[in-house]
A protein has these predicted regions:
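Short, basic (Lys/Arg/His-rich) helix/loop patches that form interaction surfaces
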Residues: 7, 65, 80-94, 101-141, ...
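Short, polar N-cap/turn motifs at the start of nucleic acid-interacting alpha helices
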Residues: 21-28, 134-154
Length: 175
């Protein structure tokens, strides 16, 4: 969850992330795959769904995201062998998106925080980046969007503080 809050990556991208996708020396994370649960095509199969790892849905979603030093400091102690999933833990088993979403909801309930879905971390990241002064093109590329319109329409939410700050930029006309 920490990585999502500071990178804006999607839940499927987080679950598909392996340690070989994180360069601790270059302070970067490379998004090359996503994980999702799909309905089985065989209606008689014992398993009604299956988990797959594929390339992201668009070319723009294949990206390298620079990581701030403090993020590297937090994740470095957990680094493991290159082909190990970042979320695999001691059991070396994958953590798929549905499990991650359930954990997120449990953490919210435990903290008595109003219900939200995991994707809200991505929205929070985008809004915080705009508040911090990121330009929209850079943010759009970090989020893996094919156009800045997607970023502006769906992910950037202005706050009253930001609105006030922008309004303070206006100066009285000189006469």
């Amino acid at each position: 969850m920490f990585l999502c809050l500071y990178t804006g990556i999607r839940i499927g991208e987080l679950c598909a992330l392996q340690w070989k996708n994180i360069s601790l020396s270059e302070n970067a994370i490379k998004i090359e795959h996503t994980m999702q649960r799909l309905q089985s095509e065989d209606t008689k199969a014992l398993q009604k769904t299956r988990i797959i790892v594929t390339e992201p849905k668009s070319y723009a979603a294949l990206r390298t995201i620079p990581l701030p030093e403090f993020v590297i400091d937090v994740i470095k102690p957990f680094a493991s062998s290159p082909n190990t999933y970042v979320l695999s833990g001691k059991c070396k088993k994958i953590v798929e998106p549905r499990i991650m979403q359930n954990r997120f909801k449990a953490y919210l309930a435990e903290g008595k925080i109003e219900e939200a879905n995991f994707h809200s971390l991505r929205h929070t990241f985008a809004t915080r980046c705009i508040e911090a002064g990121f330009d929209v093109k850079t943010l759009s590329e970090i989020l893996g969007h094919s156009s800045v319109k997607i970023t502006l329409d769906k992910y950037v939410h202005s706050s009253m503080k930001l609105k006030r700050s922008n309004m303070e930029k206006l100066k009285p006309a000189s006469v």
